Amino acid sequence: MARNVGFFICILILAMDVSAGILGIEAEIAQNKVKHLKMWIFECRDPSYTAFKYGLAACILLVLAHVTANFLGGCLCVASRQDLEKSSANKQLAVASLIFTWIILAIAFSMLIVGTMANSRSRKNCGISHHRVLSIGGILCFVHGLFAVAYYISATASTREQTSAGHA
């Protein structure tokens, strides 16, 4: 039963991240459909409410996937570099995956927020254009999904190793 729950959680994390990625790319497509005037490196364009909604939904799903992976994956405590080097391969993989998920979350979330806020109804942008910010944020959501699932699997495996070593 526990393996079925773990499989379901992995599918849930992947589904949220893939959905966030698709929404980020769809937001970029919706943003490109809005009329704009380009002069040299400056660009004036109207905001796209559809791109705003898709970008906001992508941000929410990305954060939910991250929170799900971190809370359900458990807490790994590593006090020092020597402690990390002595730990099992599962724990080392979990720590590396955790670090990468946080880095990717920070970059993807920032890009999605910048693209989403550029499409807020209260803004008519004139300035240096931010091309492909939403689509790059969406692509990073896919990468986040891979590392989040790797973290969840390795963290739960590491926890099982520690509990079975404690009973032996």
UniProtKB/Swiss-Prot annotation:
InterPro entries: DEAL/Modifying_wall_lignin1/2, DESIGUAL. Disruption phenotype: Developmental defects of pistils, some being bent or coiled or twisted, and some showing unfused carpels with exposed ovules. The vcc-3 deal2-1 double mutant shows leaf asymmetry. The vcc-3 deal2-1 deal3-1 triple mutant shows a strong leaf asymmetry. The lineage of its organism: Eukaryota, Viridiplantae, Streptophyta, Embryophyta, Tracheophyta. Involved, partially redundantly with VCC/DEAL1 and DEAL3, to ensure bilateral symmetry development and early leaf margin patterning, probably via the regulation of auxin and CUC2 distribution. The chain crosses the membrane at residues 56-76, 94-114, 133-153. GO terms for biological process: determination of bilateral symmetry; leaf development. This is Protein DESIGUAL 2. Its main location: endoplasmic reticulum. One of its GO terms (cellular component) is endoplasmic reticulum membrane. It is a multi-pass membrane protein. The gene is DEAL2. Mainly expressed in roots, inflorescences and developing leaves, and, at low levels, in mature leaves. It comes from the Eukaryota. Belongs to the DESIGUAL family. PANTHER family: OS07G0462200 PROTEIN-RELATED. Pfam families: DUF1218 (PF06749). It is found in: Endoplasmic reticulum membrane. Keywords: Developmental protein, Endoplasmic reticulum, Membrane, Signal, Transmembrane, Transmembrane helix. Residues 1-20 form the signal peptide. The keyword Transmembrane helix applies.
